[in-house]
Each structure stands twice: as C-alpha cells, then as structure tokens.
C-alpha cells in the first residue's frame, strides 16, 4: 500500500489538524468540554419523524411542540431535494433543553447528520464553535449550523449556502 492510496475520513483529518490549514484573520473559539453524569439518563425525548436514516433536525420554537406548519412545509421540500422524507429524520425542538443534555441526545438519536436551525453549536453542547453553513465533523457525526428556517426560506443566498452543505453531506 502506497502513501498515495490512503483514504482519510473528514473527521480524522480534522483531528490531525487542530489548527487551521489556512491562516485567517479570525480565530476559532474552542469551548471547554462540559462534564456530564456518567450514568445514561433514560428519557422519552419528544420528536417528530421516525429517524430511519439517522438524521437529526434540531430547531428552536417556543410556539410549537415540534415545528410550525410553515417551517415544516419548507423543511419537507428541503428533505425531498435530498431524497429524504419525514420518516428518515427526527425533528427535535431544542427550546426547553440545554447543552448539558448533548451526550444524552446523541446517545438517544444516534445521528449520522445533525442540522442545527437557530441553535448555535456551543449552545447545543458541541465543544467547538464553527461558522454557519460549514460542515463540521465531530464524534463520527456531520454537523451544520444555520439560521432558522423562517430566515432561510425567503433568502435565496441563504438557501444556496444551505444547499451547498446538504449536497456535500448527502452526496447529491
């Protein structure tokens, strides 16, 4: 096996290069890892969908149990463009939760992809901060952070940025 034929996963490359490969003017802020209880907490998380393809959609909405109808309609169109439907994902409202539940959420849903809408990575419990519309790997999960679905829907440039991320994640 030659060195030229070695294939690395994106998460492996990210762990090899903790600092940027390219110098930029802004520094990425790293959050300290939060300590949680070692015991898993058995909880009945409320979510919409069947999570068949291990894709977790995290939203924040105080006015709905899961997601308002208008946002659900837009999200359904986004999922259809990615060859997914509501049965393939779990829609989780993060409104009444906090970062201390990060490990429990990951252990319960066991996602391969997490789409954060109106929830910052650090707020969700990730030990790093990354810009919106950047695909970021952590613990064998691909994360993308973006504004709320209400903000994205009318804005073509934001939709385009999200679409670039979705194409990368779902190999479209």
Task: Describe the residue ranges of each PLM region.
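A polyanion-binding, active-site-adjacent surface
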Residues: 2-172
């Amino acid at each position: 096996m030659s060195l030229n034929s070695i294939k690395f996963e994106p998460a492996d490359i990210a762990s090899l290069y903790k600092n940027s490969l390219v110098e930029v003017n802004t520094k990425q802020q790293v959050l300290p890892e939060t300590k949680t209880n070692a015991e898993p907490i058995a909880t009945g998380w409320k979510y919409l969908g069947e999570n068949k393809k291990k894709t977790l959609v995290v939203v924040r909405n105080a006015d709905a149990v899961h997601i308002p109808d208008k946002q659900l309609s837009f999200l359904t169109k986004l999922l259809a463009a990615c060859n997914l439907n509501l049965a393939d994902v779990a829609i989780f409202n993060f409104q009444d939760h906090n970062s201390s539940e990060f490990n429990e959420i990951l252990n319960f849903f066991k996602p391969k992809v997490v789409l954060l809408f109106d929830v910052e990575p650090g707020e969700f419990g990730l030990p790093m901060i990354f810009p919106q519309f950047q695909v970021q790997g952590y613990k064998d999960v691909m994360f993308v952070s973006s504004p709320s679905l209400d903000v994205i829907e009318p804005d073509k440039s934001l939709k385009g940025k999200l679409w670039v991320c979705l194409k990368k994640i779902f190999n479209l």
